[in-house]
Amino acid sequence: MSNNPEMNYTSKELDAMSNEELARLGTELDGVTVAYRKERFPVEGDPASKRASRTVGIWFGIGIVSALAFLAVYLFMPWEYKGLGEDGLWIYTFYTPLLGLTSGLAILSLGIGVIFYIKKIIPSEISVQRRHDGPSEEIDRRTITALLNDSWETSTLGRRKVLKSMLGIGGVLAGLTIIAPLGGMVKNPWKKGELGIQGDGTLWTSGWTLHEKGVKLYLGRDTGVTAEKHETSVGTHYSTQGVSRLIRMRPEDLAAAAMETVFPLPAEFVNDGDKYDASADVYEEQMHSIHGPRNAVMLIRLRNSDANKVIEREGQEDFHYGDYYAYSKICTHIGCPTSLYEAQTNRILCPCHQSQFDALHYGKPVFGPAARALPQLPITVDEEGYLVAAGNFIEPVGPAFWERRS
């Protein structure tokens, strides 16, 4: 019961009250007085009411259509990357803009429809609330339901079946435009794709895994070149035709005590030396190799005096070629690039978290948070004198993960 003597009602008295009286009582108990309320359309069937309903319905309809369009674009429109000159490029260029346009319009039109509904249909009302302290009254349990019912009745949404349905559908679809993109974040990390220059999409593979499929992989040096500029009668344009981002390496290309970052270069994508073809365009495929998350390898040429001190890992005694050793450039801590090499100490350093690996001791960690040695890539020289991979890594590259046994 209420602690306010003036608001101390029995259950029988509350049962005798109408919904309107209970609603008014509820506002009074909350210290709120409805000073003014005016129906927008007091006369049933008022043409102005129908015009207002149509306006709101149009905006809800736009929201529904836009939300459906968003789902159609997201689910069915081609989203795979298309490069310059490839079929379907013009469709691909519209994919992201259409997602933004349809999702934005769906949410915006739903909001505009709600605003119009409030401004044009819900009764005009002025309420005054008084400040008061203390806990809520027990009687509030009875009046809150009446207040909600009163709000529903005064909104007139209950008898506007079409608008009610459109608002519900629009709200659900607008919500889907927010929830649906989250599906793109759900990925099975062990779902294998087609094995390519970047692996098959799982943590077990890299571009070097192609060696297991019989693909000859050269150790490719990054030249850093980009598309070449051409001047023609129609203007200036850039082309990658005849441009080689990765080229093959010979042992003599690397000085003693030096390090070079190399990437897998399949024989079919070679375009240098005696295999150079000015009309070939392998630039994009070579860039895919450079961008492979587990492809980067450090090729180190030790001094002859240091090479005699090397401690080989059991089972990997023949992974090197003379003074040349190839270690994964992906730190075994959390996958940062181990991009520094101290020629005097023969240590490989990860600048991110200061892990250090001994190049003379099969890439074993000697300092920092890394707990495992850098995987070593077996290398050799082919009949033409170029450095090639003699096999794949015998362990996963990069940091630890749950399924890894070591």
UniProtKB/Swiss-Prot annotation:
Molecular function GO terms recorded: 2 iron, 2 sulfur cluster binding; metal ion binding; monooxygenase activity; oxidoreductase activity, acting on paired donors, with incorporation or reduction of molecular oxygen
Superkingdom to which the source organism belongs: Bacteria
Short name of one Pfam family: QcrA_N
GO cellular component terms, A-Z: plasma membrane
Binding residue positions for [2Fe-2S] cluster: C331, H333, C350, H353
Keywords linked to the UniProt accession: 2Fe-2S, Cell membrane, Disulfide bond, Electron transport, Iron, Iron-sulfur, Membrane, Metal-binding, Oxidoreductase, Respiratory chain, Transmembrane, Transmembrane helix, Transport
Cofactor(s) the protein needs: [2Fe-2S] cluster
Transmembrane segments: 56-76, 98-118, 166-186
Subcellular location: Cell membrane
Cofactor binding description: Binds 1 [2Fe-2S] cluster per subunit.
Cross-referenced InterPro entries: QcrA_N, Rieske_2Fe-2S, Rieske_2Fe-2S_sf, Rieske_Fe-S_prot
Topological category with respect to the lipid bilayer: Multi-pass membrane protein
Main subcellular location: membrane
Keyword Iron: yes
Disulfide bonds: C336-C352
Residues covered by the Rieske domain: 291-388
The protein's role, per its UniProt record: Iron-sulfur subunit of the cytochrome bc1 complex, an essential component of the respiratory electron transport chain required for ATP synthesis. The bc1 complex catalyzes the oxidation of menaquinol and the reduction of cytochrome c in the respiratory chain. The bc1 complex operates through a Q-cycle mechanism that couples electron transfer to generation of the proton gradient that drives ATP synthesis.
Family statement: Belongs to the Rieske iron-sulfur protein family.
Subunit structure of this chain's protein: The cytochrome bc1 complex is composed of a cytochrome b (QcrB), the Rieske iron-sulfur protein (QcrA) and a diheme cytochrome c (QcrC) subunit. The bc1 complex forms a supercomplex with cytochrome c oxidase (cytochrome aa3).
Name listed for the protein in its UniProt record: Cytochrome bc1 complex Rieske iron-sulfur subunit
